[in-house]
Amino acid sequence: TNPQRIIEVNDRIFIQGYGAAYPDPYTYPVQLYDIRTKTTTVIGQGTHMAAYGDKLYVAYCSTADWVNYTTTFYTYDTCTGQKSETSFLKDAPTKLTTGNVYLLEVNPMNGDIYVGVTYYEAGEGDIYRFKADGTFVETFESGGQGPNAMVFF
């Protein structure tokens, strides 16, 4: 219900959404849609997702008070159907697990992973870049409060 992002990987359709319409509580399901049976299977929770190769990358950012956040990262192998609860980010700065993650993108040319964090009115957001293997590379300002999209040339 209430989809936010749809991605096709290996002829499979993945839908990340809110799971409900306001004012009902959001459940943020990430679902695999079966085009033949027109059914969905929930593979986990997520507020952002991206894909590269055979992998679906998912970030799930949760909060109870809109001040303190907890973010987890996982992958889903689109060929085997296996979900790995282990974060795909190595040596990630603490801000990525305690901040409000607003962006998750993968560069289609080299697999580099970009994660954006917003601080809302407190200042510009930050973008964290990781190599395709999850190794941390750098942090840079997003140029605005809520980094929510990347364009790769």
Question: Which role fits each region the language model picked out?
Answer:
Residues 1, 35-45, 82-96, 135-141:
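A short beta-strand motif characteristic of beta-propeller blades
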Residues 1-31:
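Solenoidal tandem-repeat scaffolds enriched in leucines and small polar residues
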Residues 1-9, 43-55, 59, 96-106, ...:
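Repeated scaffold domains used in trafficking and secretory/extracellular systems
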Residues 14-16, 57-60, 115:
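Residue position within the beta-strands of beta-propeller blades
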Residues 19-20, 62, 119:
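Residue-level signature of beta-propeller blades and closely related beta-rich strand-turn architectures
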Residues 22-31, 65-75, 122-128:
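Structural motif
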Residues 23-64:
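Long, well-ordered mid-to-C-terminal structural blocks that present hydrophobic/aromatic surfaces
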Residues 95-134:
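C-terminal structured domain segments
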